[in-house]
């Protein structure tokens, strides 16, 4: 694995604030390779025999799930861009994701975006790449899990979405002073 990391094909990822060890995961770093191994490789014989159009429905069906991690990376990159432009209301020296045990729920939990300044959590975020508007449940879940990544009550909670937000989500965000809804359209301006 380390050899593949040296040539930039794989990336070792740890939860932000992690000390290394058993929680680290390995990911294919290049999205072109991820796409190939997820969609093209399993259908290669079909495609090589001129039946590529028969592979399209399976690719279209799997694309939203494939795009989830891609969108998370886009959101983290956007935060770095905003940080460089001086547009953030909080300091940030690193940004990543967090995963681990949720002792309240007795299950595994993940937070897509965690920004830190040294050892202080300065932002938590959730990223949703879906075709329908993002619902209030996603913001509630983020708010409930924020403490797992060291966030306090005033730590910003940002919900990133490819699509719009439901009215219930917008209303909840208005009543949660630390919340911000970031649409994909805003990120690509």
Predicted regions, residues:
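A cross-kingdom feature that marks ATP-driven nucleic-acid transaction machinery
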Residues: 15-16, 20, 24-189
């Amino acid at each position: 694995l380390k050899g593949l990391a040296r040539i930039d094909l794989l990336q070792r990822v740890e939860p932000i604030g992690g000390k290394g060890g058993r929680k680290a995961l390995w990911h294919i770093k290049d999205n072109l390779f991820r796409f190939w191994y997820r969609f093209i490789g399993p259908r290669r014989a079909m495609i090589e025999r001129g039946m590529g159009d028969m592979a399209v429905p399976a690719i279209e069906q799997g694309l939203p799930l494939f795009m989830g991690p891609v969108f998370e990376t886009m959101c983290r990159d956007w935060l770095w861009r905003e940080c460089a432009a001086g547009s953030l209301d909080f300091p940030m020296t690193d940004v990543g994701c967090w995963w681990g045990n949720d002792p309240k729920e007795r299950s595994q939990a993940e937070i897509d975006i965690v920004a830190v300044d040294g050892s202080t959590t300065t932002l938590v975020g959730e990223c949703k790449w879906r075709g329908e508007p993002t619902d209030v449940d996603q913001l509630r879940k983020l708010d409930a899990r924020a403490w797992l990544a060291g966030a306090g009550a005033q730590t910003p909670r940002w919900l990133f979405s490819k699509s719009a937000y439901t009215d219930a989500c917008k209303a909840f965000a208005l009543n949660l002073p630390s919340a911000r809804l970031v649409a994909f359209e805003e990120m690509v301006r």
